[in-house]
């Protein structure tokens, strides 16, 4: 095999990158500890530009371990290296502060954060899946199912703690993403009713109804999911199976649903949606869109391919899709038109019109 020619400095840099990849479990596990210790929320509460030392943080977190400041300093150093925190030299210790990335990993004014997503993907339940990915590639099947002898949806229905953690992660993402979507997307205007298929505990629908209070909202998900849902004004929680039927409405909203299923399952869901809609009504889809070129290295591309790999490990047939693949699904399900409308935090809004 021909070797790619590189200069000595490029070759050394490649070796350093390879070493970083070899130790890449460090960052998510450090973040997990920082979140569990409430480190990021504590730094965020201090506000932008206000620096705290490891000793300050150990005191604020009421850590009795005498070695805690030194241990925190090492955790903080990792986070500063990845721009999760800012830093500057103090008289005795390095000092650390909030950054825009930290903003999304700590609770915002709505109490929402991306942190629960990180925690659910570093949970022992999901981590166990990755130890079975190699066997899944060799022998077929899905890593999560091999690890637990059941699907992730079946597991969630039987493990209340994991179910709550999973729902919390979806709630946080929905709150942050939908707030941005509602600032730019105008497709909810004029609707009399909307059905959120796979709407979890209703966080997304609650935000839509809060902005458009004349809309009747139906939050539709599996019975064990809506059973964990709070009472919300203007929202009716309905338990059921989207493969059997979907409640009728002026529009049907699906956020992060299709990436959990293969093409044939997505077609079944879309056809049920098509049946539930009147003429000239629409399905509103919110999903990541994979770029056509797999060689991109920007944050949006990496985030999308990370989620695609998660679907590979967790869900039979689950995957992220390109724009062309979404358009093909829409047309095959009988929808007349497909429109990519707007984007918020890498989640695209698409309309499939009947």
Swiss-Prot record:
**Record-listed E.C. numbers:** 2.1.1.69
Keyword Chloroplast in annotation: no
The protein's matches in Pfam families, at most eight in alphabetical order, are given as: Dimerisation (PF08100), Methyltransf_2 (PF00891)
Give the activity regulation note: Inhibited by Cu(2+), Ni(2+) and Co(2+).
Organismal lineage: Eukaryota, Viridiplantae, Streptophyta, Embryophyta, Tracheophyta
Alphabetically list the UniProt keywords: Methyltransferase, S-adenosyl-L-methionine, Transferase
For this chain, one GO molecular function annotation is: 5-hydroxyfuranocoumarin 5-O-methyltransferase activity
Summarize where bergaptol binds, as residue positions. 121, 259
Catalytic activity from the UniProt record:
a 5-hydroxyfurocoumarin + S-adenosyl-L-methionine = a 5-methoxyfurocoumarin + S-adenosyl-L-homocysteine + H(+); bergaptol + S-adenosyl-L-methionine = bergapten + S-adenosyl-L-homocysteine
Q: Does the keyword Methyltransferase apply?
A: yes
Query: What is the active site of this protein?
Result: 259
Q: Where does S-adenosyl-L-homocysteine bind?
A: 174, 198, 221, 255
Q: What name appears for this protein in its UniProt entry? A: Bergaptol O-methyltransferase
